[in-house]
């Protein structure tokens, strides 16, 4: 064990990729999951679209650099958490490893993450890229939800560490509610919610646009994103919140100042109702999406009710938040309150239906917030990949050569670090 280089942990999300070395508390880099390529596409030449000849093949950029290249086509290879374009993903990983981590892939084990309900074929593609193109000595593909549970251990005593819980993972492109029992995801009960960070940004953009506050149109999206990240919070009661702003606006309304990218002049806007209306679409999705009207607390309740009866109480007791879109102030508190109401109402109803003969035992609902929420998945990966067990459960290059990519279909659960 001694003298071995730390494993590389890479968590690829729809919006951002988090990368760094195991054992660290935070990722070294957080970059947008996009890649800028030169497209040579003429009409009808699909095959030649991006495989340029010779040295042009290296002419691409990823992350923040990719966004700044106007003469290149910017692509996002991951949609709703799942890789859609494997050619681009391979190029993306190439720069992640060599340019950002500056690692020699043959010397480091790798921990990559996968979304819930990822297909076994996708794991095989990942294994092929890592073992064939980068020649890594070992690879482990971890489920994001399990890592998020592990990350929540920072907020509890060692005796209470458990890999049973409900993970609410809300990123840029998709929100999942994932029940996990003893480190295994209960796949049949996963629900996904079509509302995530990007939808909140769009919704705030729309609110600002309706008010016509003088934002340059080409900057309206980044302004909405900045407003969301700086000023938004979750309120306990919509009507009261509106009243607060109407009676004492100066105390609540914030000023956002931006610089017009073209004229370089400053512009400033007032940020009012947007502050609490943005994140409110988690609890009232119909504000932004008329096709989906189920609040997040009801989705969580339904997920847990679908699970086997003997794990329901532990699932209510350990609801873990993960991902950037759960970072709004009081998000956890509001979710806990709404969920508690739903659960208590059900218990009360069952008591009434039994004519008072049944006294149900109250259910403990706990939503756990911790300071690692935003990079919970990466941090969980960093913790697990720095334990000695990690190297025993990794799939090695030798196994891969003997058996083939199918070994990566199954990755054993490990590390209830008791």
UniProtKB/Swiss-Prot annotation:
GO terms for cellular component: Arp2/3 protein complex; cell projection; cytoplasm; cytosol; nucleus; site of double-strand break. It is found in: Cytoplasm, Cytoskeleton; Cell projection; Nucleus. The keyword tRNA processing does not apply. Gene3D superfamilies: 3.30.420.40, Actin, Chain A, domain 2, Actin, Chain A, domain 4. The modification N-acetylalanine is found at residue 2. Belongs to the actin family. ARP3 subfamily. This is Actin-related protein 3. It comes from Bos taurus. The gene is ACTR3.
């Amino acid at each position: 064990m001694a003298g071995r280089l730390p494993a590389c942990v890479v968590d690829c999300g729809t919006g951002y990729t988090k990368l760094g070395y195991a054992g660290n508390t935070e990722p070294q880099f957080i970059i947008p999951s996009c890649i800028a390529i030169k497209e040579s596409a003429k009409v009808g030449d699909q095959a030649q679209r991006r495989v340029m000849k010779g040295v042009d093949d290296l002419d691409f950029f990823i992350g923040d650099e990719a966004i700044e290249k106007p003469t290149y086509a910017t692509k996002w290879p991951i949609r709703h958490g799942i890789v859609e374009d494997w050619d681009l993903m391979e190029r993306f990983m190439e720069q992640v490893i060599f340019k950002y981590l500056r690692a020699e892939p043959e010397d480091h084990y790798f921990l990559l993450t996968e979304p819930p309900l990822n297909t076994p074929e996708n794991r095989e593609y990942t294994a092929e890229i890592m073992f064939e193109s980068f020649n890594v000595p070992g690879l482990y593909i971890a489920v994001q939800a399990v890592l998020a549970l592990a990350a929540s251990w920072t907020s509890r005593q060692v005796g209470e560490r458990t890999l049973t819980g409900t993970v609410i993972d809300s990123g840029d492109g998709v929100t999942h509610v994932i029940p996990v029992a003893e480190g295994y995801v209960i796949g049949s009960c996963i629900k996904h919610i079509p509302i995530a960070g990007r939808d909140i940004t769009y919704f705030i953009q729309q609110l600002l646009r309706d008010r016509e506050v003088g934002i340059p149109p080409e900057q309206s999206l980044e302004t909405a994103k900045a407003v969301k990240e700086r000023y938004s919070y979750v309120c306990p009661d919509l009507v009261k919140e509106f009243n607060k702003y109407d009676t004492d606006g100066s105390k609540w309304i914030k000023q956002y100042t931006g610089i017009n990218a073209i004229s370089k002049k400053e512009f400033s806007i007032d940020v009012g109702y947007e502050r609490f209306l943005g994140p409110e679409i988690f609890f009232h999705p119909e504000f932004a999406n008329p096709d989906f009207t189920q609040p997040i607390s009801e989705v969580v309740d339904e997920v847990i009710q679908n699970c086997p009866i003997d794990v329901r109480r532990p699932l209510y007791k350990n609801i873990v938040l993960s991902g950037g879109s759960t970072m709004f102030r009081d998000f956890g508190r509001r979710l806990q309150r709404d969920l508690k109401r739903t659960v208590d109402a059900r218990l009360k109803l069952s008591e009434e239906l039994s004519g008072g003969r049944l006294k149900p035992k109250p259910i403990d609902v706990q939503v756990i917030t911790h300071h690692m929420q935003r990079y919970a998945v990466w941090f969980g990966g960093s913790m697990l990949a720095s334990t000695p067990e990690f190297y025993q459960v990794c799939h090695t290059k030798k196994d891969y050569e003997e058996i083939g990519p199918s070994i990566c279909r199954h990755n054993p659960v490990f590390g209830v670090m008791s």
